[in-house]
From Swiss-Prot:
This is Small ribosomal subunit protein uS8. InterPro entries: Ribosomal_uS8, Ribosomal_uS8_sf. The keyword Protein biosynthesis does not apply. GO terms for molecular function: rRNA binding; structural constituent of ribosome. Belongs to the universal ribosomal protein uS8 family.
């Protein structure tokens, strides 16, 4: 059976692995997922990510990040725009998750950006996910 929302699958794998205190999590590779992982790394939510060759296709391995006492750096992660209901926002109406404590990942014509980068550039786009 084909997967209808591979981005939601990625976010769920990250959420579950973080809750279970796993060191790494593997998932099928795509450029879009690698771009999301790049944003999460840049914002300090994960340690690192690598693309590995598998028997069939490529695998994206994400190394999760925890605090000194084992607290999760990803407290929550939520898919916003879904295949059945796409969510878009203009640059002046971009959401600020948890009053600015989290990030919104936005798919724009300039690639994937956070809401702060979109505000700086004055562009809007599709709201992919919230991370806090």
């Amino acid at each position: 059976m084909t997967m209808t929302d591979p981005i939601a699958d990625m976010l769920t794998r990250l959420r579950n692995a973080s809750a279970a205190k796993h060191e790494t999590v593997d998932m099928p590779y795509s450029k879009f997922k690698a771009n999301i992982a790049e944003i999460l790394k840049r914002e300090g939510y994960i340690k690192d990510f690598t693309a590995k060759e598998a028997k069939v296709g490529q695998t994206l391995e994400v190394t999760l990040k925890y605090g000194p006492n084992g607290e999760r750096s990803i407290q929550g992660i939520k898919r916003i725009s879904k295949p059945g209901l796409r969510r878009y926002a203009k640059s002046d109406a971009l959401p600020m998750p948890l009053g600015g404590l989290g990030i919104a990942i936005i798919s724009t014509s300039s690639g994937l950006l956070t809401q702060k980068e979109c505000l700086d550039r004055g562009i809007g786009g599709e709201i992919v996910a919230f991370v806090w």
